Amino acid sequence: MASLATLAAVQPTTLKGLAGSSIAGTKLHIKPARQSFKLNNVRSGAIVAKYGDKSVYFDLEDIANTTGQWDVYGSDAPSPYNSLQSKFFETFAAPFTKRGLLLKFLILGGGSLLTYVSANAPQDVLPITRGPQQPPKLGPRGKI
């Protein structure tokens, strides 16, 4: 493998098409980059995961720390919101829980927004729709 690296490093190469690029017409020589192959000494060992003391992976006495806190978001407390407000949002937000209805709502909303914007956009944005702004200049014989 070392002989291939030294062989590639000794022979310079000429790039075609660049011979006449300089004023004198000299050829451009490029030496390829020398590549060296290094072997890394890597120690291989067993990977050990530890939990707590003495490599205990699952502790039946401490389920909360073993499996995580599952009831972080759960609460038995009554809702802090007004019951009428909760009923309103449960009634009118229920159709938007399904993807199809939400998609239809977004399409209708986007279409109505596009219609409104296109109806209120100024019409004379392009010069071709405005027409000539100055009288035409006469040519050399008094013609347009």
UniProtKB/Swiss-Prot annotation:
Which organism does this sequence originate in?
A: Spinacia oleracea (Spinach)
Q: Where in the cell is it found?
A: Plastid, Chloroplast thylakoid membrane
| Similarity comment | Belongs to the psaH family.
Q: Which UniProt keywords apply?
A: Chloroplast, Membrane, Photosynthesis, Photosystem I, Plastid, Thylakoid, Transit peptide, Transmembrane, Transmembrane helix
Transit peptide: where?
A: 1-49
Full protein name: Photosystem I reaction center subunit VI, chloroplastic
Q: What does this protein do?
A: Possible role could be the docking of the LHC I antenna complex to the core complex.
Positions of transmembrane segments: 104-122
GO MF, any single term: molecular adaptor activity
Under the heading Pfam families, the entry gives:
PSI_PsaH
Membrane association type: Single-pass membrane protein
A single GO BP: photosynthesis
Q: Which gene encodes it?
A: PSAH
Q: Which GO terms describe its cellular component?
A: chloroplast thylakoid membrane; photosystem I reaction center
InterPro entries in UniProt: PSI_PsaH
Could you tell me which PANTHER family the record lists for this protein? PHOTOSYSTEM I REACTION CENTER SUBUNIT VI-2, CHLOROPLASTIC (PTHR34787:SF1)
